[in-house]
Every structure is written in structure tokens, then in C-alpha cells.
């Protein structure tokens, strides 16, 4: 390798572009070839002449001249001597910037280990040689010997313990063995030289073969792990062409001097880079060692010097990694080469990813209400500086100045010509504004500058929310785009009038807020006794004249002609109507403007205009809206006065009554009727209830005050500022406050801010206020860090193709919580592509085929058809090899169109999730710590009509009450019939491939009905383990059941309440199986009533239904037909309903068609919200076990009844398990283990009957929710951390069986129907949530705790994980009112799943247990299968975002994220290639990024120009 010459790339010969970047180990020869000379002296510069010393660290001969084209001694100056070497000083005459790239080297006297390969786990040198890191260090630091050749040496005299190669010996062992066996070839040495020789002598190929044999033969897992570690290192050396001995340094490279500068400060001092100090120590020690060796010094001294040299080199590469860090003059550790590149201040993040740029400036912002949407006000002073070069050119071009110098003078003097030219330059040159923190793409937008006087930038009020800016002193930065392409992109893509929709949710972001909302709201209000009320006007113009002449109030109700129709409206609303744009197709419907316009309504209006009119129309409309809002907010003269804050009279009586009720509860507690937690819960409930009552009264008062024109009410109601919760604090009562730990203080603040707080109340308030401020400060950092991790994991996701061709998808339904709709199916399916046909449940025809993109109209059609679940394509199921495809992503929410290839969807997703994170954290203190607890649920109520079906539900009867005895796997369903049996017969159910056939066999006939398999509710959905049941089919019979004619055999589930999520154990059921549930049925459409009866699976028309009839048969439907005789709506009329119209009557949408006959059964079940009862399953006699007063239970005396009750202590001695045992007549023993704080309701030896309550356990105390749970919860989910108390989850469906405990752990066995079983050992401290003999589904929790996402993936698969993660993450954001589209979370989740774990390596190069990216896995398997080999098998793994980002395929991207040294160590040994496919690595290398318009770089682009 001696022919390697010094390389220097001349400026013009630099490669303009390169395909890939590879990191390798440098061989000693390569280092020498890079070098321009050896650095022999530790000197830097001469302190008198300030010239660099020769052969020193800054030597000009080695590194190049200090001044351009000038040698050191001054013999050659000027450009004409370029390339000449001065004979006197040896310096080449060239530019001084070669000092940034020329390297030197130091020849070390002894080989030294590179600390990264010794100390970075796993230690690469140690792994290769198969010795421990500690031992390796002892050898390198001259504390121990390593055996180089064992010869025939033995440790003992019997010659049984052989000395092996690479054994590490201490001094005594070495001396002994050396004396005995030196003749027989024994040899051992210490230090870097021996390690280098051993590495050089390794035969990697034979080691590889040997390891592969070992791994096959060993059974121990631990051994396998170590072998695999070693295999990986050996393989990477073999594949990369690196040699192991290169990990030892013989030639130490010296960094170019301009990268470790030495700057002189005033006062004769110097600022020196730490690296120079570290190099000086290496050179000093190296020279001393050389001298000592020449002098033949004693071994011990030389050894010591060698050790010091090793330490000096260690400190240079990574100071403080091993021993104590080397400190400088000022007692702080010196910054080594590793520290220079890593961390926030390191090379990557400080200088490569975040550079300061020219042509930028910053200033304070003020509001610019007169600007257009796409304009910003730029101070002349700033513009002058920013556009200086443009200005100089323009002045010369126009002939005002002849030289640059003259032009500069003109600019300094600010002559009139300068201003004239500046106007011209700025006229068509957009600028970009940025507000830090730049959390999403809307934080940088382009504007056309308008030159203004003053020093502050003016910002359009509507773009404030996108920037999250306000005018309380915020600053913004201005950047000037320079190239033509950049200017074009600013105008086409980044102009603020183009960024109207938020990429996170597709909602408009430039919506009027605050004053503007207030103005428009005021304009749209109605007033009863106003001037000119109830008049009729001929046209809109006439109305305007009347208003201007003061003959008509803005708020008066009037009648006028609008677009050829008579409309009841007000003058104010007509003014709003006058600014609405003329849309080509569908003009804005009257219902959108002829009403009180609150913030939501204005947002909907903007959305509508955008969807139907496009960008330009919307931008113009928004400006008009802004002007209108400001104008009328000013005219309205709304202000706050103390008189607006009205305190209801009834407040004081409510508070007194509450105090009385609290006293009663305290007395009950004092007499032992209640447990402490029950007392606490009840008190908190009373005050919450009182607060709500007072608030309701107060809102009623304020709402009616000044007939709706109360200033405070207007502000809150319009959505301009404030909320009901805040008005409640002003005029109602402040309510309950929370402590910093989230628990509620039971003493409420009964005063409000108008009355003022007393000292105690003020003190209680400080808790919340202080917590708010502290949280804000802490969480902003967390949210920023989360964003950074998300960006890093998703930065390589871009749209790479139109369609990946997959048929897979994920089923989605509407999201409800406790029966309340959270997000409708319509919203969720909007902008997605179907992965399966959508079939109309009523007509069974295909509405939309697979591959259809769902827009607003189609989404509406889907919900109108009553479809409850749709299967859509998602990024998680996308099969594109890199990134995602357009179809799986759906629409780009920022544009509202299908996403185009090249869009950086990963970055958009990460920003969309990260950006609200900071808002979440900032949102805690707005409620000022006021506790928010809802009152507990006590019952479930039916919202729909139909009849009841029990699914697996078992009940006990006790005193004519029916008590639920199931703890799981049961439900009460509300259904309507879908298919009725046409005759008596036997039912048979067959499962075909995708279908289910329901067959009824009668005496002579047979009929078959075909259903789609996935339309049927699955058992785990019915049990509430996963998914939704609404809209699915239910078959209440099993194979072989007999059915009667007209009995319903297939039903549609309308509502489902499962046990235990919706109906707790031991609830009282109020409806029997088969009971009808009736409601008032509203028509819902205008049209003709037609009655039908269900026969088999079709509807048969019946005409004999009359008003007043009572329905007695299952299967009566009413259809309302519209003018074209098409079905508009269909309703099921249950039994016990009274019909209110005759057949073929005409009805309107608000008519009630049918009513319940009596006060219908609406309550399905009810229960005690505060405690969970323990119920006797059978009658028998009670016996106590481990229940001893004063030991495991305490006695609580009840004065009112004179009885005492036993309550289990909160903390029990270990091994004590208070239990009630019931022995039945048949001699069976039933055991009930009681939890702490349980109150016992039966005496020892008492007789109990079935379903009696024997004890009650209080439910846990409610803590008020705060986003503190939010942000940590989100990062916990994205990091895929296992929660502290992970729930143990059933892995298979089956029946629970308790086995005898093992080592004080409970043993649970699940027996599946096919005979397989799974066993779980559960710690005694955990609460077990299953009972013996119960049936559980895979994925159900067996113990308390949070579900770990890893378990979900392992047991239920990727789609279940998708459902779980998205619903958990969305829950946090929704609780804060933040809308984020699911697809963003899906992109991140798909990145967390981008690696797989090899289970079986087949014929591939993978090793079992390896984690590889899916892409590598697919490529390798394709390669093996092409040559006819066995492919590898892998299982999906879930990685947290940090792990996933560090495991990125790109070296540069991973290194710039975290754990830089580790990433670089691994990459250099494996000689990894980085193909520069993604964003981050290209930013770092300063290339065009390969997304968006960057995709078309170097391609020819045709541009079409629209003539119009």
C-alpha cells in the first residue's frame, strides 16, 4: 500500500455530486497518505512574531500559508507565484484556506488502541479476541499480560489446567510461567503492541466457521447471545474489507489547524481550541518515550510512559470516557474530538443542521390590520439592509451610480433615488417570515413586503394563529429568498394566502379570532324591540338605505327578498351576506349565514368557501371578513364592566344547602356508616353538583341580561375569549381546587372573583396557579424533545409511488365513549382510500368500490346509508418498499387533494403531532387548577329503539331484583330484526370462505340466507375486548336450534352494553331478554309514510296500519318516501309502540310517527357508583378467615343504628388474606377474598341467601384530570415503554383455571377449546381480575394495570396495535380539544414497526435474533429465493421512536440524532454505505433535499402557462 500519495482535491476538480457516503476504518498507510508532514514539536506559535513554529501544531510548511499567496518568510508574495514552494521556509504559495483541509500526522512509537473500539459497548477489540473489556483494559494500560503463544504451559503442577491463547495473567502468574515454560514456546506480553500483533494474526474466516458451528451446538441462551455478538463483529469485518489491526493507531492523524483555531484576543491573550492542548500532551509523551527508548531506560519507566501515551491519545479522542477527564487551566475538562461532534452544541446539530444565514434580520411584530392576506409590513430600514446587493445592482443599472463605491455612498446617505430603487426591488420579491419556535410548516410563510416607516414588522392578524404569535413583544425573523427557483416556490407554495388549511387536521387555520369574531357575532345577533322590527323590505339595497338613515336597527328582525326568495333575517346578517363570494356551482346556503355567527360557524363558513371556491376566493373573502369584524367590534363598543358580572340570588341558598348536606355526611362518617373514601367521594360530588347548579343559574341570568347583549356573555358565547368555566369563576363560585398531585381539596371556594376571596380561599387557589406555571416551564421542553424524536424517526417517509397495489386495510368505526359520540365515521373516513367495497346494508348494492377516494359527498353518503364500519388503506398496511404510496396516505390535508409523489409526509406528521404538544403543556393553567370532576355514572339508558337480547348474560333473582352475575364476556344488546324465519324449522349455520350461510330446514322447505363474514359481530367484539358492535349482525341461535315462524334469526345491533365496561358486575338489570324498547320516533324527513313488514329477508308492503294502532309483532318498519318515491329514511317500529299516523299520510321531518305506549323502559341497568359489592353466589352459612378485629380489620360503630361494622384495614401483614367462606347445603365451599377498605355486611356464622350483598369495596378516589397525564402518556406510547404496572394479558381464548400457588405466586391456567393451554404466574401484590371458570378472550387483562403495546402486537397483531395506539394517543389530544388526523399517527406507528426480528435465518446472511429493517429483510429474501434458497422468517417488533431513529438505515441521520459515538463506531467497522436517500443526511451535506421540487433536480421540467 506504499504507493498511496498525499491527496489534495483542487477546488475545480471537486466532485460536484456523489451517490453515497461510506464510513471506514483508516489504515496507517491511508493516514500517512492524507498527511502533508509529521508534526514533531508541541509548539504552536512564536509569542513574539506570532508566526507558527516549524514542525509544530500550526506549521505553515505542513498545513499551508497563513495569508493568501504569501510564504512565511515573505520571499514570495502575490498571485503570480501560485504553486511554488519557497526554498527558505518550505511553504507552498497558495490560498490560506488549504489550512482547513490539510492534515498532518504523528508517528507513535508504540501502537495505541482507539478508545472507541475498546470502551464503546460491546468492546469491538475485546469481542474479536474473545476477552472481557476489563481484562483488555488491564493489558492495554500495562497492568496485565496476555498470552501470545501458550506453548505447553500449565497453571498447576499436575498439568491438568492448560494455559490458553488470549488468557490474561497478572504479574505473579507471568513470572511463574515464564520461568517454567519459556523454553517450550510460552510467550506473553503486555500493551498495545501485543494487541496489535494478535489482531493482525486473526484468521477471520475460520473464526466465522467455528462460531457458526458453536451456535448450532449450544443450548444455553446466554452463550448464544455472546456468540451472536461476536459473529456480528466478525461478519462486519469480513464484509467491509477493514482489517482488525486498524483499530490500533500507529499513525495518529492531526486535524487541520483552521478546524482547531488559535485566535489572539486584545491584551496579548490567546483563545485556543482544547484539541491543541490534547495534541500537545500526545506529542510531548511520544517524544519523551522515543528518547527513553533510545536511552534504553528501565522497562518499568518505559512501560509507564507507554501507558501515559495511551491515556493521552484516549483523552484526545474521548476525554473522560475512561479515567478522570484531563482538565485545562481553568479546572474544566478539555473538549475532545468526540465532544466536538456530539450533542446540541456539537458539529452536527450546531453547524450542519442549524446554520445562521445571510440576508436575514429580526424585529418586533405589531399588528397590520390594513394589509392584505399575502402582505407584511417591512420597515424601510430593514429592507435597505436586506436588499442591499439587489439595490446596488439596481442603482448601477438605472445609471444613478457608476461604481459600487458610489452606490454604497448613496445608500448610506439615503438619497431619494435609493428609495425609488428600493420600491422597485421589493415590488415583486417575496420575503419569508419565521417565528420561533418553528413547530410546523406554518411557522415559516412567505409574504409580499410593503415598505413602512418605523422599526417593527407588521403582521396580518389572520396569520397569527398559524405562527402562534401575539403582539405582546414577540419577535420574528425575515429571510430573503435569492435564487429564481426559491422566489418561485415562495410565490407558489409558501405564500400565506396558500396556507389556509392546517396540515394536521385539514381545518382552516386562518380563521378570524377574538375581536373579529366578536364583531361578526355582534352583527348577526337579533334584538326583539329594535327600531324597524318586523318591517318588510323589497330588496337588500333598500335595507341598507334604511340602516344608513337610522330607520332600521342592525339587529331588528325583518323580512326581505334574497336571491328571489322571501327570507326572515336582520340587517346585520345581510351585511355579512353582502361580503360572501359568488361561488360558481353552489352558492353559500342561507343556513350558513342567516344565524348567530359564533367562532365555529365562521370557521365552517371559511371551510365551505375554501372547498367550493378555492384559494384565491378564500383569501379575498377572509380579508373582507377581517375588515368587517374589526369595524363592527369597534362600532359595538363592547367592554367589560362590573355590572356585567351578575351573581344569582339563589347561589347563597344552594351553598347553604350543600353545607348542610356535607355536615350530614360528616356525621354519618363519624358514626361509622361510611368509609373515609366514601365520605370524601360524596362530599366532592355534592360540591361539584352545587357548583354546576349555581353555574347553570348564573348562565341563565347572564344570557337573558340585556336580552343577550351582556358583554361578558357575548365574548364567551361567540368564542372570542373566555369560557363558561371562567365566567363561572367570575360570577358563580370558584368551586373545588386540586392539589399539585391532582387530588381534589374537599373544601371548595364558595366565593367568586367579583365578591373576592378570603385569605383561606386565596391560599387554596395558589396551589393551582403555581402548578400551572411550573408545569408550563417543565413541559415545553418535553414537548420540544418529543417533536425532535418524532421528526427524526419519520424524516425518511415520503410519498414514493402512486399505488402500492395492496388489498389490505384497517377497519374503522365511529368513536364513542360511554355512549357519547367523540368522532363520527364521516370525519374519520374523509380523505381516505377504501380497501374494500362499501355495501349498502339495506339494499345490498355496492355503493363504492375498493380504491375509491372518499370526499365530503361520499362520506355523507356512507353515513346516510347507515354504514357503521368501513375498511380503509393506511400507511401501516402500505406495501411501498420505501416511504408510502399516495393511495395508502389519502389526501394531503393542507391542500385537500390526493397527496402527490415527493411530498415529505413524515415531517408533516411529526410536526402535526409535536406542535400541539407544546400547546397541551401550555394549556394546564388556563383553568387555574379548578378541579373538574364529572358526577359518577349510575346507569345506562337506551338511546335507540328495538328489542333486548342477552348475550351470555346470567342473573340472580333477589327480592324481585335481577342482579348481573357475569364479570366478563357478556352483554345486553339492543337490536332490530334483519331476517325472520319464514316457517318453523331447524337452524343451521355454515361458514364458507368470506361468507356465512344461515339455513333453515322446515318440514318440506329449506331456505338459505348469505351474510358477509365481517358483517357479523365477533365474540371478542360482543365481549367488549376490541372493536365496535354497533351496525354488526348478531345471530341469537346456534346450529341445531329449533325456531318458530316469524322469529327473528338475524339481527342488527343498534346499541351494545358489555359487562364490565358499560355495565359493572352486580348491577341491577331493568330489562328482560326479548323486551321491546320504545322511544318517540321522529320522522326525520319530509314525505309519504309507508309501512312494511319483514318477511324472511325482504320487506313486504302493508297498507292496513292506522293511527292509534298498537304494534304487537316484531318486524314492522316505516319508510318515508320523498317526492321521487325514493326511500329517504327508514325506521324500525318496536312492539308496544302506538302509531300516530295512517299509512300513506304526508309527514314533515319534525313529526313524531310513533310513541311508547307507557312510560317506556329506557333504563337498561343501574348500580351503586361508589362501591363494588361482593355477592353470595349460593345460599349457605358464612365463616370468617383471617378476619380478626384489631389485627386485619377495624370496627366502625354506627350511632344511628347502634350497630358496628367491620372494615378491612388498608395495610395488612404479609400473608394475611381476609376471606369470607360460604359453605352451601351441598357441602361446597365458596371463597371471597376481600380487598383493603372493604366493609363487611354479614356476621360470622350468619345464613345468607343467593345474591345477598355480603361486603362492599369502595371505588378508588377520583383525581382530577390534567394534561400532565397527557404529554408523558403520549411519549410513553411513542417510546413503546412498558408501563410501570403492566397488566398481564390472556394470550389465547379459553376458560380460566386456578392452580395451586407456586413460590407465593398465583398460578392461572387458560384452557383453550382445542386443548392447548397457557400458564401465568402472578405476583401476590397484583389484583387479579378474573375468576375461576370464566371465559376470556385473547387480549383481555387478567390483572390490573396498563396494557403494554408490545403485548398487543405479540398477541393480537399489527392491526390491533394500530387500533390501540391510535385510540390511546388520540384520547389524550382529544381531551384537550386538539384535532389531529389519524394518518399522522399511523405514519409514526409504521416507522415504529419498521424493523423485524429474525426467528429463523433460512439460507440468508441474517443471524437469529437480529433486528433488521423490513426493507433489508425483503431484499435479502428476494435474493435468496431467486437462487432457490430458503427465505428467513421474522416477527414484527415495536421500537420506541428513539430506538427506531438510532436504528435508521442512514449513518449520518442516526449519528446526528443521539449516541453519536456509538453509531459512528458501528458504522465504521461495518464500512456502512449511506445512500443519501432521505432529508437529514442531505441537509447535513448541504445538498438539495430529495422531496417536493427537489425530486426534479437535474431533470428537465416543462412549465405550462395559463393564458387567462
UniProtKB/Swiss-Prot annotation:
Enzyme class: transferase
Annotated GO MF terms: DNA binding; DNA-directed RNA polymerase activity; magnesium ion binding; zinc ion binding
Cofactor binding note of this UniProt entry: Binds 1 Mg(2+) ion per subunit.
Keywords, comma-separated and alphabetical: DNA-directed RNA polymerase, Magnesium, Metal-binding, Nucleotidyltransferase, Transcription, Transferase, Zinc
An example Gene Ontology biological process: DNA-templated transcription
Summary of the function given for this chain in its UniProt record: DNA-dependent RNA polymerase catalyzes the transcription of DNA into RNA using the four ribonucleoside triphosphates as substrates.
Protein name: DNA-directed RNA polymerase subunit beta'
Source organism of the structure: Campylobacter fetus subsp. fetus (strain 82-40)
